[in-house]
């Protein structure tokens, strides 16, 4: 993994903001070819299409992959690089170690801010949050007079009211004022598919991205990987971009902690089912021309519980928030 070590060293020595000391552990986003922001144009490059948004990845990341007919992006929410490396090495998810030996393990930075709503929008537009406008999990929407949750598309003060911004005239499919990847690919003869859990395929955030995309829900990992294999096998001559998203590692990380054994076990389950139900059963014909990309929207940092950070410990502050 010499390439991985060299790439990490370069990212650690990336340019700093003058006069702003962020500490040694802080990495600035590498928008010049080393970030998830550069993935959409990279997909276009591999499929021999004009790019979308930011430039593609650096040449050393693009060049190894030629004659690509199909790109499958597997996005595991919150899968940090150092945890992936640990889980590859400790027997939790050895399939990715095997694939990396025959491919490339390339460190990429996320975007700023590195939150799901902002990162997924960048992956579907090729634009940074400063350009596409989804600058965080919660946003002040001046035209609607409220702070909104940009995943649920509801006022942050409301509970169990997902999508309620539509009652105020908010149209998620019309919110972004720039082309999205599905529309761009369709214009150049590439069919786009999105496989996500049934519970989120019609979420407001998903509706923002999925114009021109064939969206398919799944209920379990068995459902996901068998459906994906059938999709690939039954359309051998079709040029494809396939988006696979799973949020379980992120959910477990928030609930139990990113380094908890249950979080690792969830990724192990995800990876084993991928290997057994998709990879090992994929025909040689379907493998030919298929590029598989595993990535994440962001990582997670484990924090120690501390009562001073609990709002209940500050009743006077809490009283001023209502």
Go through the PLM ranges and name each one.
Residues 1-322:
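Feature captures the catalytic ectodomains and active-site-proximal regions of enzymes
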């Amino acid at each position: 993994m010499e390439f991985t070590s060299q790439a990490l060293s370069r990212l650690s020595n990336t340019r700093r903001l003058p006069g702003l000391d962020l500490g040694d552990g802080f990495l600035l986003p590498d928008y010049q070819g080393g970030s998830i922001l550069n993935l959409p144009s990279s997909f276009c490059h591999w499929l021999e299409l004009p790019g979308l948004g930011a430039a593609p990845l650096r040449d050393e990341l693009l060049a190894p992959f030629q004659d690509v007919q199909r790109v499958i992006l597997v996005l595991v929410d919150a899968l940090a690089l150092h945890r992936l490396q640990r889980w590859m090495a400790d027997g939790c998810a050895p399939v990715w170690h095997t694939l990396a030996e025959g491919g490339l393990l390339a460190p990429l930075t996320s975007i700023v801010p590195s939150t799901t709503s902002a990162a997924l929008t960048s992956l579907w537009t090729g634009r940074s949050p400063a350009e596409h406008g989804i600058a965080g999990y919660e946003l002040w929407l001046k035209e609607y007079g409220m702070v909104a949750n940009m995943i649920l598309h509801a006022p942050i003060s409301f509970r169990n009211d997902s999508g309620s911004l539509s009652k105020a005239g908010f149209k998620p499919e019309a919110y972004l004022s720039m082309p999205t990847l599905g529309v761009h690919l369709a214009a150049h003869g590439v069919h786009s598919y999105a496989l996500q859990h049934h519970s989120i395929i019609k979420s407001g955030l998903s509706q923002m991205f999925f114009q021109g995309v064939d969206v398919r829900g799944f209920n379990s990992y068995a459902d996901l990987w068998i459906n994906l294999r059938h999709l690939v096998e039954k359309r051998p001559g079709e040029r494809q971009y396939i988006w696979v998203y799973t949020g379980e590692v992120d959910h477990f990380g928030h609930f139990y902690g990113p380094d908890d054994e249950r979080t690792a076990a969830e990724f192990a389950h995800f990876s084993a089912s991928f290997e057994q139900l998709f990879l090992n059963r994929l025909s040689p014909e379907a493998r030919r021309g298929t590029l598989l990309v595993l990535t994440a929207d962001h990582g997670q940092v484990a924090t120690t519980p501390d009562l001073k950070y609990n709002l209940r410990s500050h009743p006077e502050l809490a009283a001023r928030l209502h």
